[in-house]
């Protein structure tokens, strides 16, 4: 990745709220399936804004060293085909994770905050276009500079 796009908490909140507006009326949804881990943050905003309390997760590991995507590994999945659920992730990048999500939850509404060209067509809605060669630094990954997770120390 040659470029970086740094997202602040304020920016993230604003974009996630905009995504929430597009999902109204809230009464059409049974719940949210958050793609762990990046989708946990927008799921919290969507849940608050839409008044949704039923939150499930699907846990898929794809980024193995903060930079390169590796083979997908499903660690946990919410049951069902997604009918009446919003599936949310922070980003659709190459589309590898998105294709797996679509296979698991074909009847869900799949949304992300950010989308890169290679994966954008795989989600039903997103807020911000990001160039394919750009790495997104999400606010939960940052201190004043990148802070590695405690488990890696």
Swiss-Prot record:
Gene3D superfamilies: 3.40.50.2020
Topology term for the membrane: Peripheral membrane protein
Record protein name field: Xanthine-guanine phosphoribosyltransferase
UniProt-listed SUPFAM superfamilies: PRTase-like
Residue ranges of the TM segments: none
BP terms from Gene Ontology: GMP salvage; IMP salvage; purine ribonucleoside salvage; XMP salvage
Positions annotated to bind 5-phospho-alpha-D-ribose 1-diphosphate: 37-38, 89-97
Residues bound to GMP: 93-97, 135-136
Subunit comment: Homotetramer.
GO molecular function annotation: guanine phosphoribosyltransferase activity; hypoxanthine phosphoribosyltransferase activity; magnesium ion binding; xanthine phosphoribosyltransferase activity
Keywords carried by this UniProt record: Cell inner membrane, Cell membrane, Glycosyltransferase, Magnesium, Membrane, Metal-binding, Purine salvage, Transferase
One cellular component (GO) term of this entry: plasma membrane
Function: Purine salvage pathway enzyme that catalyzes the transfer of the ribosyl-5-phosphate group from 5-phospho-alpha-D-ribose 1-diphosphate (PRPP) to the N9 position of the 6-oxopurines guanine and xanthine to form the corresponding ribonucleotides GMP (guanosine 5'-monophosphate) and XMP (xanthosine 5'-monophosphate), with the release of PPi. To a lesser extent, also acts on hypoxanthine.
Cofactor(s) needed by this chain: Mg(2+)
Catalytic activity, EC: 2.4.2.-, 2.4.2.22
